[in-house]
Amino acid sequence: MGNEASYPLEMCSHFDADEIKRLGKRFKKLDLDNSGSLSVEEFMSLPELQQNPLVQRVIDIFDTDGNGEVDFKEFIEGVSQFSVKGDKEQKLRFAFRIYDMDKDGYISNGELFQVLKMMVGNNLKDTQLQQIVDKTIINADKDGDGRISFEEFCAVVGGLDIHKKMVVDV
């Protein structure tokens, strides 16, 4: 990882060269088979993600080329969204993408149900969960199209300061 490798990463992230070096060491420790990319199992060895019911969604978002693994560039770009230097909109967009499973720019009733189901497991009956989903869509959907746009999502969660909790220490 010479200067030529880290320079572009500085351009596409909120990290400086030293932070990228530290993240490179962390990435290499996680990359148990030295393949140059992280599998789901390797990613799961991060203590911060082991108890997270949405870990698969996080991996799906980090994995921008869709090959099922996270390479170093995807890792840097993904973690950068959680940098203290990351802006509110970027963090909210990441949170939105957790729910927007089909990447169409909207959160549908079905997508909201699936993600909430990942979070609550069997603690709620599906009918109870569906009622919560329906009510959430009704409250958030200002244009009446039956789904939640990024703007509608921000109107609901933007004032909750969730972006301040979406930070990792590098």
Swiss-Prot record:
Marked site (Interaction with PxVP motif in substrates of the catalytic subunit) residue numbers? M118, N122
Q: Does Aminoacyl-tRNA synthetase count among this protein's keywords?
A: no
Query: Which compartments is it annotated to reside in?
Result: Cytoplasm, Cytosol; Cell membrane; Cell membrane, Sarcolemma
- Residues the entry annotates as binding Ca(2+) 4: D141, D143, D145, R147, E152
What is this entry's stated membrane topology? Lipid-anchor
Q: Please, what other remarks does the record include?
A: This protein has four functional calcium-binding sites. Although African swine fever virus infects pigs and not humans, human PPP3R1 and PPP3CA have been used for the crystallization. PPP3CA and PPP3R1 interact with African swine fever virus Mal-047/A238L (via PKIIIT and FLCVK motifs); the interaction does not block catalytic activity per se but inhibits PPP3CA function by blocking the access to the two substrate recognition.
Q: What is this protein called?
A: Calcineurin subunit B type 1
Species per Swiss-Prot/TrEMBL record: Homo sapiens
The top of its lineage is:
Eukaryota, Metazoa, Chordata, Craniata, Vertebrata
Supply the gene name. PPP3R1
